[in-house]
Amino acid sequence: MSHKDLTSGEPAGRPKPRVAVLFGGRSSEHAVSCVTAAGVLGAINKDKYDVIPIGIAKSGQWVLAGGDTAQWSLAGKALPEVAPSEQTVTLAEIGGEHQLIVAAPNEVPQELGTVDVVFPLLHGPFGEDGTIQGLLELSDTRYVGAGVLASAVGMDKHFMKVVFESAGLHVGPYVAVTDRQWQKDPEAVRKQVDRLGFPVFVKPARAGSSMGISKVDSLEGLDAAIEEARRHDLKLVIEAGIVGREIECAVLEGRGTDAPRTSLPGEISVAGGGHEFYDFNAKYVEDDAASLSCPADIPDEAIARVRELAAAAFDAVGAEGLSRVDFFYTPDGDLIINEINTMPGFTPKSMYPQMWAKSGLGYAELIDELIHLALNRKTGLR
């Protein structure tokens, strides 16, 4: 497909750019992705864009996901899921253009039309880790969000910390544990963790939405926490517990050569209910389990520093589009970077869009800006 007509955000020969919204996926965060899609599909400006929702079943099958977007929302504690279908969606090049094709057994394939930009709302492995980005790069299809390398680094908490440290950003003490290390010499791992001091947080290195994370207060609970994390990823990161307030900042790519834009920082407060930290249920299931204060009640100089460091973290991993950067603000005023999320939760109640709303950029406008950035960013080396 020729991209020369897309730089204005309005391709010639058709009144509206066509946006394929991808969600679901093969990871344990499948349901979170569906909930994110419900928010985006409900808010995207359909007068401006021709929107095609495409669900990815847990098997990896791509299906056309039409109908009421409410089907992807949380219903109580029931988690939504993309069901497999006899009809399969593929992205193919036909006549020099990228077309979505729907095919079913014993039926003639149907063309859904040219895709101008893909909005991948995929969380976790096989989506947020550079894999879907690599597929879209190979097909020369523009897409929202970070590229292959930034997505991969942002997914791996170990290499993320290595990159941050090399950029001079302050990260907390941690131990990275591979499958081989744990299988070969678990006692050596226990000694490393014991030197960190307790409590510690045991995390899968390449999972999000707080999946598989445990807080461990003593050596006795370590093995069980490690095995729980290994259910999600055989590579782990074990972090020393840090006394501090949880501060977040939303980052949005600048236009052209402009610097990344940052929101007012927000503070996460977990309101008990059995939650020792900001876990999956507090994030997505229980409406009153956590709250966001934005702007965070910290000194003005700390707010400025959070925004500066968030932009630096965005640049350090080479992010594009959007990211959320999380910090600990310690009692002595130090800021310790916890992580960057290159595809943060994007439901209307998620912290990323909430912080932008508090900063003057509404949910629908934020979606529009991300699509604009993607339409005006070429694939390939940049």
From Swiss-Prot:
Which residues are noted in the entry as ATP-binding?
193-248
Positions of Mg(2+) 1 binding = D326, E339
Concerning PROSITE patterns, the annotation shows: ATP_GRASP, DALA_DALA_LIGASE_1, DALA_DALA_LIGASE_2
Where does this one sit in the cell? Cytoplasm
A Pfam family it matches:
Dala_Dala_lig_N
Q: Which residues bind Mg(2+) 2?
A: E339, N341
The residues covered by the ATP-grasp domain are 161-372
Kindly list the biological process annotations in GO that this record carries.
cell wall organization; peptidoglycan biosynthetic process; regulation of cell shape
What are the required cofactors? Mg(2+); Mn(2+)
UniProt GO molecular function: ATP binding; D-alanine-D-alanine ligase activity; metal ion binding
**Recorded catalytic activity of this chain's protein:** 2 D-alanine + ATP = D-alanyl-D-alanine + ADP + phosphate + H(+)
| Cofactor info, note text | Binds 2 magnesium or manganese ions per subunit.
Quote the function comment for this protein.
Cell wall formation.
Q: What is this protein called?
A: D-alanine--D-alanine ligase
Q: Which organism is it from?
A: Pseudarthrobacter chlorophenolicus (strain ATCC 700700 / DSM 12829 / CIP 107037 / JCM 12360 / KCTC 9906 / NCIMB 13794 / A6) (Arthrobacter chlorophenolicus)
